[in-house]
Amino acid sequence: GLVIHRAILHDLTGVPQLLDWLSDGEAAIVRMEKLMTRELELQTAIDRISAFVESDLGGQIIRLTESRLMLLPPGCRGVRGLDAEAFSVDSSDLR
């Protein structure tokens, strides 16, 4: 089955662990509240995550809430459902 990790991203030092999980074929739900007030660090984290997940790995990023993302490895897809449900977003929408 699919392993789904829960994580709180406090700063950029947590990004490599997220990428490792995705490389291993595991998903992650990431809370980013701690970075929301640090715009440059938030943007850097999103850029690194989206470059790896979408471009290098072929996975998907789903925006669950304003400060929460779900990172999916290749072979897993989020689909649009009801308006209140999560849906796939372009990485430029995360900025």
For each of these PLM feature ranges, what is it?
Residues 9, 33, 65:
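Conserved residues at beta->alpha junctions
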Residues 20-22, 62-63:
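Conserved catalytic network of the ASCE P-loop NTPase/AAA+ motor domain
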Residues 1-14, 21-22:
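N-terminal intrinsically disordered, cationic/polar leader segments
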Residues 34-39, 77-78:
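Short acidic, S/G/P-rich loop/turn micro-motifs used as interaction or catalytic elements
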Residues 49:
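Residue-level signature of catalytic and energy-coupling elements of molecular machines
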Residues 22-36:
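Short glycine-rich, basic-tinged beta-strand/loop micro-motifs
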Residues 52-95:
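Helix-rich interaction surfaces within compact, conserved domain-sized segments
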Residues 10-14, 18, 38-45:
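Helical mechanochemical/support elements of P-loop NTPase systems and associated helical scaffolds
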